[in-house]
Amino acid sequence: TGSGSCIPTNTQQNSTFLSQSFYDDDGVKLELENQTIIDKFNSITGIEQRKYINKDLNTSDIATIAAQDAIEDAQIDPETLNYIIVAHNFGDIPYGSKQIDTLPNLSARVKSKLKIKNPSCVAYDILFGCPGWIEGMIQAKAFIKAGMAKKCLVIGADALSRVIDKYDRDSMIFADGAGATILEASDESGGIISHTSATYTSENEADFIYYGNSCNTKVDQSKK
């Protein structure tokens, strides 16, 4: 019944990466000119720019902004929310740090920032990779269908600029942002028609999202 978003204002054009040094997975510096790398990247992805959050913001901040937007759009009292579900992957990471902060969970931080006092408004996180928000929607729908909830707030948020390896050319893919949706019980027909979920962990699939070392072996790998 309502949706909201937070799109950062700090725009990074592809040209931002012209002076960056890129390395491969073996730590060898790429010999291609950066303009060639950028042009090929653009031809494959179509990406010309990405948005990064400002230094004074964090993932829970942009999640809250998106949530406020969705609440206003739905015109509901936030105290009537039964669940707040936040899908993310890396929690809060202050600018200049690589330390992941997930305790208290981001959903609790969002609830606090929204000044919701109702203890029956249950707030929890899910770490589910890229489709985390979709899985959050599936869970919210299940709560409503089971009669366990009437109103749910589902948020997807990440500040990937805080965790990317700037020496990896794939870092140009990632950006920051948050989106939020209000789901409400209704007597009318409609809603999510069908869905399915899956988790693949065979061979090395469990490590597809792995916070590893920098491609540049000359930098301090102890700092995350």
Residue ranges of model-derived segments:
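Flexible, glycine-rich active-site loops centered on histidine and acidic residues
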Residues: 145-178
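Acidic, glycine-rich active-site loops and adjacent beta-strand->loop/helix elements
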Residues: 4, 87-92, 127-132, 156-161, ...
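Phosphate/pyrophosphate-binding loops at sites that engage ATP/ADP/AMP, CoA/4′-phosphopantetheine
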Residues: 66-82
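Condensing-enzyme catalytic core mediating Claisen C-C bond formation in acyl metabolism
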Residues: 1-56, 168-224
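Short acidic, glycine/serine/threonine-rich loops at helix termini
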Residues: 11-13, 96-98, 137-138, 163-168, ...
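Beta-strand segments within the central parallel beta-sheet cores of soluble alpha/beta enzyme folds
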Residues: 41, 79-86, 121-125, 150-157, ...
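Conserved catalytic cysteine-centered active-site region
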Residues: 34-60, 93-151
